[in-house]
Amino acid sequence: MVYTTRQIGAKNTLDYKVFIEEDGKPVSPFHDIPLYADKEENIFNMVVEIPRWTNAKLEITKEETLNPIIQDTKKGKLRYVRNCFPHHGYIHNYGAFPQTWEDPNQTHPETKAVGDNDPVDVLEIGETIGYTGQVKQVKVLGIMALLDEGETDWKVIAIDINDPLAPKLNDIEDVEKYFPGLLRATNEWFRIYKIPDGKPENQFAFSGEAKNKKYALDIIKETNESWKQLIAGKSTDSKDIALENTKVTDSPYYSASAASAIPAAAPQADAPIDKSVDKWFFISGSA
C-alpha cells in the first residue's frame, strides 16, 4: 500500500495540517491504516510525526475528523522541544503505531499507571531521516516505559525494514551491539527533555530498562485490543477522541463521506522558526 500526504497551510503555523491519503483519499492515521504491514512476519506500519533532529512537537490529533498531524500548542502558542546538550531536537524519527490506544481507563499491572490516551509511540532508529506523514514499515526490537506526569507512555524501539542494518537487528540486545550508546542516550533524553520548560525530570518504569521484543509485541497487542474496543464504541470512556474512519466498516463511526469533507491540499512555504528554538540547554547531571 502506498500512502501520500496532503498538506494544508505552512509548517510552523497554527494552520498547518498533514492528512494521510490512500489512493488520493484522506484516511485516518489513527484508525484506518492497518497496524500490521505483514502480521506473520511482525512487520508494522509506523506513522512518522516528527523527523529526527527537528524541534516542532507534531502529533496525530485526537480532536479532528480523520486525525491529521498538527503542531501541538500550549496557551495558544506552538510547542517546540528544547535542545538538551548534546542532543538536537528529537533524537529519533518519532511517530506512532496506527490502530493502538494507551487506554487511560486502565492501569497497567507492572507500571502501576494508566495509559496516556494516545496511540503507542515509536522511536525509529534507522539511518534515514523520515518526513511528517510518512508511513514506514518497521520491525520491533524492544520497548521502554516512560512515566510521564503519572501516565504510562510506552516507547517502542523499531527500525525501518529497508535500513541496511535491519537484517542484523532482531531483539533489544542487538541495539546495544550495533548502536552502542543509543539506549543510554534515549533514556537520558526522555528523562531530561522537559526540564528546560520548568518541569521535573521524567521517570521510567523498570528502572529505565528497555524490555525485549517479546514484551514489546505483547504491549502492542494489548494496545491494539484497547483500540478495537474504542473504535467499536465499547470503551468505558472514549475521551472525546474523533473516531470517524473510512476503513473499519463494522465500526459505528465508519463514514463513507468523511474523506470528502477534508479540504483540498493547500501547501505553503515553511514559516520561520523563532531563533530561541535554536538555544542549547545544559542540564546538570545529564550525560
Curated annotation (Swiss-Prot):
Parts of the chain that traverse the membrane: none
Name of this protein: Inorganic pyrophosphatase
Enzymatic reactions: diphosphate + H2O = 2 phosphate + H(+)
EC number: 3.6.1.1
Pfam families reported for this sequence: Pyrophosphatase
Annotated localization: Cytoplasm
CC cofactor: Mg(2+)
